[in-house]
């Protein structure tokens, strides 16, 4: 019986081995077939990818002819419809904003100009100071070329969409009331009161606040006062929320479907226009009854303004100008103020030097003078260097848009008539050949340094230089003056990740505690 059992066991073992062998062979065959299928699929994807890119490039460039195509900058159009947008968004959303242009440099060399397909248009990316200067200073060869989706948000009668002659007309009417010496002198007391009361409130709060959120509210309150003569807190908050939503859609893909940032931005634009139209209607009705605002705020000045031909601005022009300026006042000043404060707090030697300058200026003020004057702020040389370095390093406006009106050569490469041009200010500001050790915050690099045209583009260049630059710098200077003399900032998450779209900011909005310090 034992022998029979042993034989049965051997037989069962043999059968098991045969089954295992068959299963192993089948599995190997399946694995080999699957691997081959994956390999074939991968090859097919590569072929399809290359074919789609080549076909898209041919479609966009065929009309140029062989001679003009040969003079194009290096680069590629990428996939149809998408082009370089996925790479652009991936770089910025992954926290590596310089990786987008770096990929062109790595693949095509350091030529300073590259071709791509961005925001639904064939586009040339200009990344050098010399190239940006050439484009920005040539108003005959280049006109404003912002994407249609952006124009729909900011407004067709705003500076980003106006032709040169109309831009010059509107700028002339609005420049003095915004950046003029008398205008800034008039704005200073309100800016000062708003800053000091805000700092006191944050310190009295005792706990942590979202520093960036509070700064944006503060700067928006200032800009609403300047442009609309103020508004109640509920209206100001509603406007501020709408501008926040508007900005999230500015550099998003223009997908007008539920759940996408661009659709929300369009809704925000409609709300803003409705509010501003309501205020404008009230002003015009009051004037019709003989009750004039007397030019006490920017809206009154825009209503009253007329050019040398006696032409007044219409409602659409006034509203789009206000949308543009209010947005700039809401975003730029608040972000730069936050980063300048953070950079100073992180660098005690720089903080001490900036504070010493403010203390020296305070000692020089006559006892008969109440508060600081505009001339006092223009003596703050080191603080100005801090602000310029923050503007360079943070890159609030990292890119600008133009369109070629004729065939133009930049850096020896052709930009065809009708093509879009992106001016990458960020690449200029982060170029080690222009700014050694560019990722370092170093205000001293500005001592005795007058930047060459095209190397510092925080406010643009040429005829379309940002018309509110002096107002923005005044707001930032007033805040830093009071902060340096009486407060300190302790961040809750000092190593917090930075989000770069639509503007660089910590993901926690710089959660921090603000406390008073002794004099």
From Swiss-Prot:
**Pfam families in the cross-refs:** p450 (PF00067)
**Tissues showing expression:** Expressed in roots, developing leaves, the vegetative meristem, and suspension culture cells.
Q: What pathway does the UniProt record associate with this protein?
A: Plant hormone biosynthesis; gibberellin biosynthesis
Name the major location.
membrane
Record flagged with keyword Cell inner membrane: no
Q: Which GO terms describe its molecular function?
A: ent-kaurenoic acid monooxygenase activity; heme binding; iron ion binding
Look up the record and name the cofactor or cofactors this protein needs: heme
Binding residues annotated for heme, in chain numbering = 466
Its subcellular locations are: Membrane
A Gene Ontology biological process in which this protein takes part is:
pollen tube development
Q: State the UniProt keywords alphabetically.
A: Heme, Iron, Membrane, Metal-binding, Monooxygenase, Oxidoreductase, Transmembrane, Transmembrane helix
Q: Which InterPro entries match?
A: Cyt_P450, Cyt_P450_B, Cyt_P450_CS, Cyt_P450_sf
Q: Which SUPFAM superfamilies match?
A: Cytochrome P450
Q: Where are the transmembrane segments?
A: 1-21
Query: PANTHER family, per this entry?
Result: CYTOCHROME P450 26 (PTHR24286), ENT-KAURENOIC ACID OXIDASE 2 (PTHR24286:SF356)
Family membership noted in the UniProt record: Belongs to the cytochrome P450 family.
Name-wise, this protein is: Cytochrome P450 88A1
- Organism of origin is Zea mays (Maize)
Q: What's the name of its gene?
A: CYP88A1
């Amino acid at each position: 019986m034992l022998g029979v059992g042993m034989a049965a066991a051997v037989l069962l073992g043999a059968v098991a081995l045969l089954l295992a062998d068959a299963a192993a062979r089948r599995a190997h065959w399946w694995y080999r077939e699957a691997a081959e299928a994956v390999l074939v699929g991968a090859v097919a994807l590569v072929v399809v990818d290359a074919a789609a890119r080549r076909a898209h490039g041919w479609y966009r460039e065929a009309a140029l002819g062989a001679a003009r195509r040969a003079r194009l900058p290096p680069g590629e159009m990428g996939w149809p419809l998408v082009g370089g947008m996925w790479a652009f968004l991936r770089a910025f959303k992954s926290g590596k904003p310089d990786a987008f242009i770096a990929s062109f440099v790595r693949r095509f060399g350091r030529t300073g100009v590259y071709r791509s397909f961005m925001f639904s248009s064939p586009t040339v990316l200009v990344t050098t100071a010399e190239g940006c200067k050439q484009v920005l200073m040539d108003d005959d060869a280049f006109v404003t070329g912002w994407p249609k989706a952006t124009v729909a948000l900011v407004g067709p009668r705003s500076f980003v969409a106006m032709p040169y002659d109309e831009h010059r007309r509107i700028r002339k009417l609005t420049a003095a009331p915004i950046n003029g010496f008398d205008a800034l002198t008039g704005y200073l007391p309100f800016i000062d009161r708003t800053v000091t009361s805000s700092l006191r409130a944050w310190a009295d709060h005792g706990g942590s606040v979202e520093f960036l959120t509070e700064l944006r509210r503060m700067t928006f309150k200032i800009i609403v006062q300047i442009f609309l003569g103020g508004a109640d807190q509920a209206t100001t908050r509603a406007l501020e929320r709408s501008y926040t939503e508007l900005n999230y859609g500015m550099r998003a893909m223009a997908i007008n479907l539920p759940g996408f940032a661009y659709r929300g931005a369009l809704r925000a634009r409609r709300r803003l226009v409705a509010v501003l139209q309501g205020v404008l209607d009230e002003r015009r009705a009051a004037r019709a009854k003989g009750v004039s605002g007397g030019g006490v705020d920017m809206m009154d000045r825009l209503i009253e303004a007329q050019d040398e031909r006696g032409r007044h601005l219409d409602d659409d022009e006034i509203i789009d100008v206000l949308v543009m300026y209010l947005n700039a006042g809401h975003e730029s000043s608040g972000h730069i103020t936050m980063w300048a404060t953070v950079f100073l707090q992180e660098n005690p030697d720089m903080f001490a030097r900036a504070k010493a300058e403010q203390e020296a200026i305070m000692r020089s003020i006559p006892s008969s003078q109440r508060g600081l004057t505009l001339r006092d702020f223009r003596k703050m040389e080191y603080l100005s260097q801090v602000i310029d370095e923050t503007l360079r390093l943070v890159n609030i406006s990292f890119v600008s848009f133009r369109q070629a009106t004729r065939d133009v050569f930049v850096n020896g490469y052709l930009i065809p008539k009708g093509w879009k041009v992106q001016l990458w200010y960020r690449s200029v500001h982060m170029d080690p050949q222009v700014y050694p050790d560019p990722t370092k915050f170093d205000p001293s690099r500005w001592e005795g340094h007058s930047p060459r045209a095209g190397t510092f583009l925080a406010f643009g260049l040429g005829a379309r230089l940002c018309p509110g630059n002096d107002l923005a710098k005044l707001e930032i200077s007033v805040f830093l003056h009071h902060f340096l003399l009486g407060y300190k900032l302790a961040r809750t998450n000092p190593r917090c990740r930075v989000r770069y779209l639509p503007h660089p900011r910590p993901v926690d909005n710089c959660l921090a505690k603000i406390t008073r310090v002794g004099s």
